[in-house]
Every structure is written in structure tokens, then in C-alpha cells.
């Protein structure tokens, strides 16, 4: 009798437990369906910390925030010649599983590391400057630097005359985009090229401090120089410092730059810089990362995207800030 009293309650408990399990399964919230595709991880690498590349980054960050299907990892080198820094960033991003890298290459030296990334299925979009000899990139999103240089040269041809002296502050010799800015400028001079004298050509690594020292050497050796062309924006700021130190007045030396950075535009307004070729870094950044994303998603993208140039002078400087 006592045995039956024990068994009945146990059977009842087991029965209730079974009902509870079934009921909880029926009332439980259905599992959310899995996303058909995971978020695409992309890398975005820029050369070094100056306004131009910060603008590229900020544009890519805005795109990233507005694109839920993507996650962008950012890295930046220390200088215009920091090949090692970019190579390390490429390696790090590949290790973190990016499916694509958008990069402003410091030089052709980084292409070997990009080849390794491509072998692992990573797409590569070059921004700001091309590596013409390297054919494995998916796309190039950049200023046409040769055309920009021609624009500068044509402008200089309206300011110079036969017999005038021209100095050139190069960027990083051997970097195709920067060389194109110089070659384009010389081409843009047209027939005047053979009538003027290029008295000095010095490299600056696109750095303000190196631009300052190069400008000191150039102006000391050529005190009667008529014009100076700079293939990058930061060296112009160093040049302006030298002009002021040497007691020059705005306009004494024709100064034409490339980049039209905010600080350059301020010098254009003040009369120290005569003109600069403007790029559109925000456009490069946003189109660069968007083009990369489309290619990773299997969409067809153009091999080249020209983001345009414009000549900035005192007449239109207000349109470019500074």
C-alpha cells in the first residue's frame, strides 16, 4: 500500500515534467534566422598622417557607418616612404581575415606583399596613386596625376617667359604618381619648356621639414629664381617659411603646388602660394572603399576611376576652404 503511494506521485511528477517541456518548447521564441551572408571585413590603409589622408579616412569611416554589410579596419603609415609600415599593415589585415584592401601605396615595393594577399583571395583597390607596372589590382581610384601636372604646367606657362628660372620640389622619386605630377607639369609648359631653365630639382619626400631644407638650398643657390613647382602640398609650407625668412614678399617668387591642402589654400589667399592643383580626397576615400566592397561582393567595377582635379588660385580659393 505504501509502495503505491510513492509510485503514483512520481508518475504524476514525470507526467507534469513532460508536459512542461513540451509547453516550453511550444511557447519559446523561435530562433532568429541566420543571415545569408556574414559582414564583409575590409582593410583601408593610407600613407601617413596629414590632412589629405585624414580626409580619405574620414570619408571611408562615413561610408562604413552607413553600410551595415561591411566592417572596415583602418591603418596608416608614419611617412610617405614608410613601405615597412604598409607591409606590416597588409600582413595584419590579412591575418584578421579581410576580404579586400583599399590602399594608398607608398611605392611599388608594397606590391609583393599585396601579391601574397591576392593569393589568399583578397581583392586590392589602389587609391590616390597607381603602381602602373603592377597588374593584379582590381581597380585604381585616384586623381589622374599626369593630367593634374599638365594643368599646373599650363598655368605656369601663362606666368613665365623665355629665360626665366624654374625650380622643382619633387615628392618621392620613383613613386609613379609623384613622378607623373612633375612630368605632366613639364609637358604642360609646351613650347616654353625649351625656353626656360630648370635650375634645380630636389626631393622632399612630401614632407614639410624636408621641403623647408630643400627650399633653403634651392633659393641659396639660385637667388634669382622665378618660380618653384612642388609635387606635393606639405613642402610648399616649408618653402613659404623660407621665403619669409629671406625677406621675400608675397608674389616675389611664383609658387605652384599640388594637393591644395587647407594650409596651402590659406597661403594662396595670403599671396604666398600662387596656385595649387586640388585633388578631392573625400571622393577618393568614399569611392575607393565603395569600389572595393562592390568587387568583393562579385560586382563588376571599372579598372580606373578618375576623381578629378581643379586649379586653385586666389580667385576661387574661397571654394576650397583654408
Language-model regions, residue ranges each:
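N-terminal signal peptide c-region/cleavage motif recognized by signal peptidases
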Residues: 23-25
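A residue-level marker of the well-folded mature domains of exported/periplasmic proteins
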Residues: 3-9, 27-322
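Bacterial N-terminal signal peptides
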Residues: 11-21
